[in-house]
C-alpha cells in the first residue's frame, strides 16, 4: 500500500455472518496523539466495495447504500507488524450485515494528502438509512476525524460542519445533537493552528425565550431583579443589601453624590440603555475597588443628573462631560465605619481615578428627613424623629416626606399641596398665582404671594413714582433758578461798563469814548486839531515886540 509522506491509512471494515474479520495492513504506523477512527457503513447482502491498485481516491466520492442490520458475531484482529506509538488509539467499528458482505482495499492504493472524506450519518425511526459522503481532509501527519449528526424524531435541524486541520495538528471531532422539541440551528467549527491543540467554539441561537435576564428569576427572595441593557442586579428594600449567599442582609447606609466623567450623556435616565449600564458598571466597580478591605456590601444608584444636587458648581471638560450620581453605599449592620471614615476613603480613591472627579458627603439625617439627636446620628431611619412639616407615611418606611393631598396636584398647573391650620391638606395655587375660573392664574401687576395677597410691589411702585416725580420737579426748579441768576449778573456788569466808558474823556491824548454806544474799546482821533492846545502857542496872550 502506498501512502503519502506522514499519512495514516484508515481501514474500513465490514463484519459478515457468521464470522466477521477486521484486518489492518502490516506496516501501518500511527503517530503520537493521532486517533484513527474507522467508519463503517451498513450494506445489503452481496455488496462489495473494491478499490483497484493504483486507484486515486478523489474528494467528494459518495457511496450511499441502504441495509438492514442483523445480529452477527463480530471479531476484530490486528495483523502482526502493526506499530502503535504511545498515546495512539485504534478504535475499529464493526457493523453487522447479512452474509457475504466484504469491503477491502487492494495494496497499491494511493490516497492523496488533500483527499476529503466527510462521512455523514442520518438515523431516523423506525427505518434506518445510512449514507456516507467521503470528504475527510487528511494532511501529512494528520488523522481523519468524522463528524456525526443525529436527528431525533421530532423537530428539524440543520448543521454545517467544518473542520480544518493544518499539518502537525491533532483533530478533535465536533458533534452537535439537536433536541427533540423545537427548531434550532447550530454551526460548529474547529480551527487548529500548526502544532497546537484544538480549540472549538460553538455558537447556538434559539428561537424561543426572551432577552430579559430577569425572566429566569436570578435573585433570591425577597430581592427583586432590576434589568439593565443586557445584564441585571438584585435590589433589596431600604436598609438592606443583596448578598449572593444569603439574599437580603440588613446593613448600614452611607448616602452621597459622586461626579463621573463620561463621553456620552444621552439616555442616562433610561436604565435599559447602553449608556446607563456602562455608567452603572463604572460606579459599582469604583466603590468595590475602594472598599475591598472593608465589610462593604453593595452600592445602589438612586439618581443620575447633569446638575449637582449638593453643589452649585459644575465642571465641563473639552472632550467629556460630568454627570452627578446620587448613590447609597451599604455596609454591614455592625460596621466600624462611620460617615467621616467612608468619605475620607472615597476622596482618597478619587485622586487616583481619572473617571471620578469629586465626592460629596450627604448627611444621613438629611437623607432620611430626620432631626439630628444623640450619638446615633440617624443610624436607624425607622426610629429617628421626622423634621417639622414632614411625616413618615408608612411605619415600615424610614423616610420622612411631606404629606400629600387627597386630590391630585400638578406642578404644570401651578398647584401644590398646602396644609391648613386644622392640619388638613388642600391643593392650592403656587405663590404668585390665585385661583380664578377653576384654575390658577397669574397675579395682576403689583400683587404677589399666596393668593395674590401681598401688595408690596404695588406700594413700592406708587411710592417710587411719586418720589421720582418730586425729584424731577426739584431738578427743573434748580436749573431755572441758576439760569435766571446768571442772566441778572450779566446785565449789571454790562451797565457798569457802558456808564464808565460814556463818562470817560481823554482830552490830552485825544482819546474819547466814541465806542461806548457799540463797543467797549475807545477810539483815537487821527486828524490834526485846528487849534493847538499848547498855551504857549497862543500869540494873543503874549505881547509882541514893537520893532
From Swiss-Prot:
Q: What name appears for this protein in its UniProt entry?
A: Mucin-13
Gene this chain is encoded by:
Muc13
Its main subcellular localisation, reduced to a broad class, is: membrane
Q: How is it modified after translation?
A: Cleaved into two subunits, alpha and beta, probably between the first EGF domain and the SEA domain. Beta subunit contains the cytoplasmic tail and alpha subunit the extracellular tail. The homooligomerization into dimers is dependent on intrachain disulfide bonds. Highly glycosylated.
Q: Where are the transmembrane segments?
A: 459-479
Q: Respond yes or no to whether keyword Signal is given for this record.
A: yes
- Intrachain disulfide bonds: 214-225, 219-234, 236-248, 365-378, 370-384, 386-400, 409-427, 429-440
Spell out where the chain is glycosylated: 243-244, 263
UniProt keyword annotations, A-Z: Cell membrane, Disulfide bond, EGF-like domain, Glycoprotein, Membrane, Repeat, Secreted, Signal, Transmembrane, Transmembrane helix
Amino acid at each position: 500500500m502506498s501512502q503519502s509522506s506522514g499519512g495514516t491509512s484508515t481501514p474500513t471494515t465490514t463484519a459478515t455472518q457468521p464470522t466477521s474479520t477486521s484486518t489492518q495492513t502490516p506496516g501501518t504506523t500511527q503517530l503520537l496523539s493521532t486517533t484513527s477512527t474507522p467508519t463503517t457503513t451498513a450494506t445489503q447482502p452481496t455488496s462489495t466495495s473494491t478499490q483497484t491498485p493504483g486507484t486515486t481516491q478523489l474528494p467528494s466520492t459518495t457511496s450511499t447504500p441502504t441495509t438492514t442490520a442483523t445480529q452477527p458475531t463480530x471479531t476484530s484482529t490486528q495483523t502482526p507488524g502493526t506499530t502503535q506509538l504511545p498515546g495512539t488509539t485504534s478504535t475499529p467499528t464493526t457493523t453487522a450485515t447479512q452474509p457475504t458482505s466484504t469491503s477491502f482495499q487492494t495494496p497499491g492504493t494511493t490516497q492523496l494528502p488533500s483527499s476529503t472524506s466527510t462521512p455523514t450519518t442520518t438515523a431516523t425511526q423506525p427505518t434506518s438509512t445510512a449514507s456516507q459522503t467521503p470528504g475527510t481532509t487528511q494532511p501529512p501527519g494528520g488523522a481523519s476525524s468524522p463528524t456525526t449528526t443525529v436527528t431525533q424524531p421530532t423537530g428539524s435541524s440543520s448543521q454545517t460542519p467544518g473542520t480544518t486541520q493544518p499539518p502537525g495538528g491533532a483533530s478533535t471531532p465536533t458533534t452537535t445533537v439537536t433536541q427533540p422539541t423545537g427548531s434550532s440551528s447550530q454551526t460548529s467549527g474547529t480551527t487548529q493552528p500548526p502544532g497546537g491543540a484544538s480549540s472549538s467554539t460553538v455558537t447556538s441561537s434559539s428561537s424561543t425565550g426572551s432577552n430579559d435576564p430577569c425572566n429566569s428569576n436570578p435573585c433570591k427572595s425577597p430581592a427583586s431583579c432590576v434589568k439593565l441593557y443586557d445584564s441585571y442586579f438584585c435590589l433589596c428594600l431600604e436598609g438592606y443589601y443583596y448578598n449572593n449567599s444569603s439574599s437580603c442582609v440588613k446593613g448600614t447606609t452611607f448616602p452621597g453624590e459622586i461626579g463621573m466623567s463620561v463621553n456620552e450623556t444621552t439616555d442616562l435616565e433610561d436604565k435599559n440603555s447602553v449608556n446607563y449600564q456602562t455608567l452603572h458598571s463604572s460606579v459599582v466597580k469604583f466603590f468595590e475597588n475602594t472598599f475591598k478591605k472593608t465589610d462593604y456590601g453593595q452600592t445602589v444608584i438612586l439618581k443620575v443628573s447633569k446638575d449637582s444636587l449638593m453643589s452649585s458648581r459644575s465642571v465641563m471638560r473639552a472632550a467629556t462631560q460630568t454627570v452627578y450620581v446620587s448613590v447609597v453605599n451599604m455596609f454591614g449592620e455592625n460596621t466600624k465605619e462611620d460617615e467621616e471614615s467612608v468619605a475620607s476613603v472615597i476622596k482618597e480613591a478619587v485622586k487616583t481615578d481619572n473617571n471620578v472627579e469629586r465626592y460629596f458627603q450627604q448627611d444621613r439625617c438629611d437623607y432620611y428627613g430626620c432631626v439630628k439627636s444623640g450619638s446615633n446620628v440617624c443610624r436607624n431611619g425607622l426610629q429617628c424623629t421626622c423634621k417639622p412639616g414632614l411625616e413618615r407615611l408608612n411605619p415600615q418606611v424610614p423616610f420622612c416626606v411631606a404629606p400629600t393631598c387627597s386630590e391630585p396636584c400638578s406642578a404644570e398647573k401651578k398647584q401644590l399641596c398646602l396644609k391648613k391650620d386644622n392640619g388638613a391638606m388642600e391643593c392650592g395655587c403656587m405663590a404668585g398665582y390665585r385661583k380664578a375660573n377653576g384654575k390658577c392664574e397669574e397675579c395682576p401687576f403689583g400683587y404677589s404671594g399666596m393668593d395674590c395677597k401681598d401688595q408690596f410691589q404695588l406700594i413700592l411702585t406708587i411710592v417710587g413714582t411719586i418720589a421720582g416725580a418730586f425729584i424731577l420737579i426739584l431738578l427743573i426748579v434748580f436749573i431755572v433758578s441758576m439760569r435766571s441768576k446768571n442772566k441778572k449778573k450779566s446785565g449789571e456788569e454790562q451797565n457798569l461798563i457802558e456808564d464808565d466808558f460814556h463818562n470817560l474823556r481823554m482830552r490830552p491824548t485825544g482819546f474819547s469814548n466814541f465806542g461806548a454806544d457799540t463797543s467797549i474799546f475807545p477810539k483815537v482821533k487821527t486828524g490834526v486839531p485846528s487849534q493847538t492846545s499848547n498855551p504857549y502857542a497862543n500869540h494873543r496872550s503874549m505881547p509882541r515886540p514893537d520893532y
